[in-house]
Regions:
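S-adenosyl-L-methionine-dependent nucleic acid methyltransferase catalytic domains
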Residues: 1-381
Length: 381
């Protein structure tokens, strides 16, 4: 009998739904999925294919003078494909008026309405569910967008790194007015719940060093959501692996009995039992607000979420040897964290130009560059 190669520790380029459909047919099972989908309506990553047309050198750009590069020179130097990343309105959407070519694009986030974007996201996660273990979990970090009458503004890419900025999306749905916060994270969470997922928790990613914003009629955005969902009511979750240290004051209170704590059914008055009063608790269940600095990674596009952010997801959602999936692998952060903790990984990515960066990061022990407040990414335009 011919020996088959295990489908693990690989990243496939192309449409993630087609890839996951193939994996499902091959019997692939993953224990957890940790991912950060594209922001809605903020970036065209240049993955479109143009068919036909009378000029093979045409870039299909409406106004070249408005083309903007990312501010990370190291990235621009090492990743020429992303150097061409532009805000969506600079490209012709369907047919190029310069050369007559028609556009075919598999990227998500460029839909005409938020509802269409959510519909596509739900479909992606149906494919995730097909290869997720019955006791598996899904962790989604997703950012929001603002509606506006202007063109899409800079937000430095996919969810996970940048902050929501004003003048963002001119693709709006029913009832959405200019300057409205669209509510993409909760639209997605509720849609996934409606589609059969168990919506278990909203986790707040608090950013102590948020990217500044130039708006003057609201507060600077300094958080994003991570949603924890499960396939079934009962699922694998190793809370012990992500316990956090208990503050000295709390330990003292527990030991002295000055706090309240339910030990078992025999102590319904919530007082500590005599036995538990003498126990010093060194840790507690992890809270749902995670303070993690925005952290650049030299050579990556801005949307790399910090490895410290998803480390608890990997540890709580899987065991050593399990497979961790990311259908929007990008620069390879999820794979790097999985490998660091003796997990296997599977990933999908539409843009093949990420290949060399992914390989570099998976091999690297670097958890990101030190936070430098003078970095250009922390300066608003």
């Amino acid at each position: 009998m011919e020996k088959t190669t295990p489908i693990e520790n690989i990243i496939e380029f192309g449409d993630n739904r087609a890839t996951m459909k193939k994996w499902a047919e091959q019997g692939v099972k993953v224990q957890t999925c940790i991912t950060s989908p594209p922001y809605y309506g903020l970036r065209d990553y240049g993955t479109a294919k143009w068919e036909g047309g009378n000029d093979p050198n045409c870039q299909h750009i409406k106004d070249e003078s408005k083309t903007k590069k990312f501010g990370n020179e190291e990235f621009n130097k090492n990743a020429p494909s992303r150097e061409q990343t532009k805000t969506p309105s600079y490209y012709y959407e369907h047919k190029c008026e310069l050369c007559g070519a028609t556009k075919e694009d598999g990227q998500l986030g460029m839909e005409k309405t938020p509802e269409e974007f959510i519909e596509n996201m739900v479909d992606v996660f149906r494919h995730v569910k097909n290869i997720l273990a019955d006791d598996g979990t899904l962790w989604i970090n997703i950012g929001d967008s603002y509606a506006g009458s202007n063109s899409v503004a800079s937000n430095n890419g996919r969810a996970g790194f940048g902050n929501t900025r004003e003048k963002v999306v001119n693709r709006t749905g029913d009832g959405i007015k200019p300057k409205d916060l669209i509510g993409i994270p909760w639209m997605l969470a509720f849609a996934l719940r409606q589609d059969g997922w168990y919506l278990r928790q909203d986790i707040i990613w608090h950013k102590p060093n948020p990217i500044p914003e130039s708006v003057k009629d609201r507060c600077t955005k300094s958080h994003e959501y991570i949603f924890l969902l499960s396939k079934q009511e009962r699922y694998y979750f190793n809370y012990e692996a992500i316990k956090e240290p208990l503050a000295d004051e709390s330990r003292t209170n527990f030991q002295s009995g000055s706090g309240s704590f339910v030990v078992n059914e025999d102590h319904k008055d919530n007082d500590l039992s005599e036995k538990s009063k003498n126990v010093v608790y060194d840790s507690r269940n992890k809270r749902d607000v995670w303070s993690v600095n925005v952290r650049p990674y030299k050579g990556a596009h801005f949307a790399t979420y910090p490895m410290e952010l998803i480390e608890p997801c990997v540890l709580a959602g899987s065991k050593p040897g399990d497979i961790v999936l990311d259908p929007f692998m990008g620069s390879g952060t999820t794979a790097q964290v999985a490998k660091r903790h003796d997990r296997k990984y599977l990933g999908c990515e539409l843009n093949p130009n990420y290949g060399s960066l992914q390989e570099e990061r998976i091999k690297s022990e670097n958890w990101g560059d030190p936070v430098n407040p003078e970095d250009p990414i922390f300066k608003f335009e």
